[in-house]
From Swiss-Prot:
Residue spans of biased composition, Basic and acidic residues class: 523-555, 575-608
Organism taxonomic ancestry: Viruses, Riboviria, Pararnavirae, Artverviricota, Revtraviricetes
Residues bearing attached sugar chains per UniProt: N113
Official protein name in the record: Glyco-Gag protein
Keyword terms of this UniProt record: Glycoprotein, Host cell membrane, Host membrane, Membrane, Metal-binding, Transmembrane, Transmembrane helix, Zinc, Zinc-finger
Protein topology in the membrane: Single-pass membrane protein
Transmembrane segments: 64-86
Cell location: Host cell membrane
BP GO terms, sorted: virion assembly
Post-translational modification: Glycosylated by host. Cleaved by host near the middle of the molecule, releasing the c-terminal half containing capsid and nucleoprotein domains op GAG.
Cellular component aspect of the GO annotation: host cell plasma membrane; membrane
Pfam families for the chain: Gag_MA, Gag_p12, Gag_p30, zf-CCHC
Cytoplasmic side: 1-63
Length: 627
């Protein structure tokens, strides 16, 4: 076409040949049918817009087109979501850790029941990062296996630098969730086998291998749980024996549901056989399995605090970890207040009857290493020989107070006697180790408080004597020193009246306390003291006001007297001046000058009188009362 004349720069368009030129397609573009091509420059043809103007956005051309596009986009989105959910459906795994986080309110409630506090972030850190490093089988996602929880608790409660006292609340809460599981934990907890009663008459069976425990748990009661142990096979008795007596045989002991300071988390106790115990009925030996307790591992203590059942058989109950934790946190240290901690340990020794291993656990939890060594040393010093005096024989000391685990069977009378003697020596060691070096300044620093009774003050004074001096305040030889300290260090009002007592030397300490109680009880109450102070203040104000008024009246009276004298003096002087002036004035003639006393002119015409301007007349002064 370049060779055609007058066609350079021409634009070719398609002319539609449709019978309906105004009809549009689906997306707004006009349909292109067969046609012919003409030059734009032909003025006889109709001008058509370019195709770009026909193919505009679908949203501006047709509502149906917009509806179709939205439907396509929505279908694609639904298909994508369906594929994503179908791929991930069934892949969510619930772990003990995630389960506890989902029910965190219940976990906090369980911790509160154990008297401990926990934090969510610390909970996740210990479960996923800290406890898996103990190498006891703890998974990173947590577990409710009581055996694994027990091993972690042993690690946490280890004495010395290997222990983790800050993790005690968390492992105690884990153990509580596994021991008494909520409904959302029960599907993840292994079922517990029924507790097995060990009667005193049982034939011996091969012992089961003990659960492996780390060596550092040798001083603690066994914390292994029989949750995963299989029930032992029943041994058929002799067919010639009598049948079982179901009416007279005692049922197995159940766990005490009541709260106790020693069986809070204790597992099901096993009954220890008693030597020489007779059968409860002649038919017991028929169908009752005879067993001997399994051989204990050398690194695991199988002794627990003793408790006697209803049938005279001893059961063992472990110390509750929450009780140990509360005893440690709710009492001062042995160095700060040895008397209070000694009283606590004494009550535990008397009520729980702990074994040698339990005593070591108790000392390791409540005392530091140095305090424990000091207590053990003082206890060994308190061992007495056959003559009743402290002995120095190593054999006698080791027999009475051994440092290594002895072979004392608490099921025998001899073993229980050893344990009783051991507890007595341990208590004596606590009392002797609690005494501080002699410091009389500490004793003199004990003074009676403003509202403290004399009896309470005397108890504090005696406790200071026991703690800071080697003297016993209950000794009659020390009564005089205690009495003098009681008088001098009492409250000022009580001390002054006690010092003025007649025949003070013959008064005993009890007499002084009774006199001090009388003085203390006669003290005015705070209300009476306030009323007395108010009354004294009012009287003092009235007396001061009266004195001020009397002083003011006396001052006014004195001023009036002085003023009267002054006025009388002034008046008398003026009168005398008036009388004297009248007598001294000479008689003038009618032509005599009053100024120069010459005759022939008057005073106004006197040449000797000065003619200058007259000065101001002096003003008379007025006397006031202040002058």
């Amino acid at each position: 076409l370049g060779d055609v004349p007058r066609t350079s720069g021409a634009i070719f368009v398609a002319r539609p040949e449709s019978n309906h030129p105004d009809r549009f397609g689906l997306f707004g573009a006009p349909p292109l049918e067969e046609g012919y091509v003409v030059l734009v420059g032909d003025g006889r043809l109709k001008q058509f817009p370019p195709p770009s103007e026909f193919l505009l956005s679908v949203w501006n051309r047709s509502r149906a087109a917009r509806l179709v596009c939205c439907s396509i986009v929505l279908c694609c989105l639904c298909l994508t979501v369906f594929l994503y959910l179908s791929e991930n459906m069934g892949q969510t795994v619930t772990t003990p850790l995630s389960l506890t986080l989902d029910h965190w309110k219940d976990v906090e409630r369980t911790a509160h029941n154990q008297s401990v506090e926990i934090r969510k972030r610390r909970w996740v850190t210990l479960c996923s990062a800290e406890w898996p490093t103990f190498n006891v089988g703890w998974p990173r996602d947590g577990t409710f296996n009581p055996d694994i929880i027990t091993q972690v608790k042993i690690k946490v409660f280890s004495s010395g630098p290997h222990g983790h006292p800050d993790q005690v609340p968390y492992i105690v809460t884990w153990e509580a969730l596994a021991a008494d599981p909520p409904p959302w934990v029960k599907p993840f907890v292994h079922p517990k086998p029924p507790p097995l009663l060990l009667p005193p008459s049982a034939p011996s069976l091969p012992p089961e291998p003990p659960f492996p425990t780390p060596p550092q748990s040798s001083l603690y009661p066994a914390l292994t749980s029989p949750l995963n142990t299989k029930p032992r096979p029943q041994v058929l008795p002799d067919s010639g024996g009598p049948l079982i007596d179901l009416l007279t045989e005692d049922p197995p002991p159940y766990r005490d549901p009541g709260p106790s300071s020693s069986d809070g988390n204790g597992g099901s106790g096993e009954v220890a056989p008693t030597e020489g115990a007779p059968d409860s009925s002649p038919m017991v030996s028929r169908l009752r399995g005879r067993r001997e307790p399994p051989v204990a591992d050398s690194t695991t203590s199988q002794a627990f605090p003793l408790r006697q059942g209803g049938n005279g058989q001893f059961q063992y109950w472990p110390f509750s970890s929450s009780d140990l934790y509360n005893w440690k946190n709710n009492n001062p240290s042995f160095s700060e207040d040895p008397a209070k901690l000694t009283a606590l340990i004494e009550s535990v020794l008397l009520t729980h009857q702990p074994t040698w291993d339990d005593c070591q656990q108790l000392l390791g939890t409540l005392l530091t290493g140095e305090e424990k060594q000091r207590v053990l040393l003082e206890a060994r010093k308190a061992v007495r020989g056959e003559d009743g005096r402290p002995t120095q024989l190593p054999n006698d000391i080791n027999d009475a107070f051994p440092l290594e685990r002895p072979d004392w069977d608490y099921n025998t009378q001899r073993g229980r006697n050893h344990l009783v003697h051991y507890r007595q020596l341990l208590l004596a060691g606590l009392q002797n180790a609690g005494r501080s070096p002699t410091n009389l300044a500490k004793v003199k620093g004990i003074t009676q408080g403003p509202n403290e009774s004399p009896s309470a003050f005397l108890e504090r004074l005696k406790e200071a004597y026991r703690r800071y001096t080697p003297y016993d305040p209950e000794d009659p030889g020390q009564e005089t020193n205690v009495a003098m300290s009681f008088i001098w260090q009492s409250a000022p009002d009580i001390g002054r009246k006690l010092e003025r007592l007649e025949d003070l030397k013959s008064k005993t300490l009890g007499d002084l306390v009774r006199e001090a109680e009388k003085i203390f009880n006669k003290r005015e109450t705070p209300e009476e003291r306030e009323e007395r102070i108010r009354r004294e203040t009012e009287e003092k104000e009235e007396r001061r006001r009266a004195e001020d008024e009397q002083r003011e009246k006396e001052r006014d009276r004195r001023r009036h007297r002085e003023m009267s004298k002054l006025l009388a003096t002034v008046i008398s002087g003026q009168r005398q001046d008036r009388q004297g002036g009248e007598r001294r004035r000479p008689q003038l003639d009618h032509d005599q000058c009053a100024y120069c006393k010459e005759k022939g002119h008057w005073a106004r015409d006197c040449p000797k009188k000065p003619r200058g301007p007259r000065g101001p007349r002096p003003q008379a002064s007025l006397l006031t009362l202040d002058d």
